[in-house]
């Protein structure tokens, strides 16, 4: 069965398609071109390009960035969104200047990750998944970053 025909996962959140694709400076476009040249199949460049677009779009992959990637890689928007929502290092919402990510897996919880999350939450006055009012800190629980 062709991978183009399989798309049974619903989007975890809607993407506003009433935007124009992002545009970038010639330097950023050249950086993207260099990455694309490394891969014989354009789709294989999806993660490096997501990191570039995220960096250039204010620290997260916004709808305009998603549309840009879909156009540039000749992929469906759902293909881009599935990858973006799978990896915890791709932000699909704005995050604070300092993004604190604490592992939520059992092995890290046993070693004290829960205590770290509770301490950060207490000091910052936010719960995991939230950003401080001054947009300085975001606290997130993620899959293990060390494995």
Language-model features: locations:
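Signature of N-terminal electron-transfer/Fe-S-associated modules in redox systems
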Residues: 2-147
């Amino acid at each position: 069965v062709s991978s183009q025909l399989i798309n049974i996962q619903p989007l975890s959140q809607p993407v506003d398609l009433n935007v124009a694709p992002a545009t970038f400076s010639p330097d950023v476009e050249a950086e993207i071109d260099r990455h694309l040249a490394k891969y014989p199949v354009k789709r294989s460049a999806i993660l490096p390009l997501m990191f570039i677009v995220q960096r250039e779009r204010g620290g997260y992959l916004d709808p305009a960035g998603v549309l840009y990637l879909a156009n540039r890689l000749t992929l469906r928007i759902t293909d881009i969104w599935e990858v973006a929502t799978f990896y915890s290092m791709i932000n699909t919402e704005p995050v604070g200047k300092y993004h604190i990510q604490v592992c939520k897996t059992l092995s890290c919880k046993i070693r004290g990750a829960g205590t770290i999350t509770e301490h950060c939450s207490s000091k910052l006055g936010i719960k995991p998944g939230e950003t401080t009012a001054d947009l300085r800190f975001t606290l997130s629980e993620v899959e293990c970053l060390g494995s």
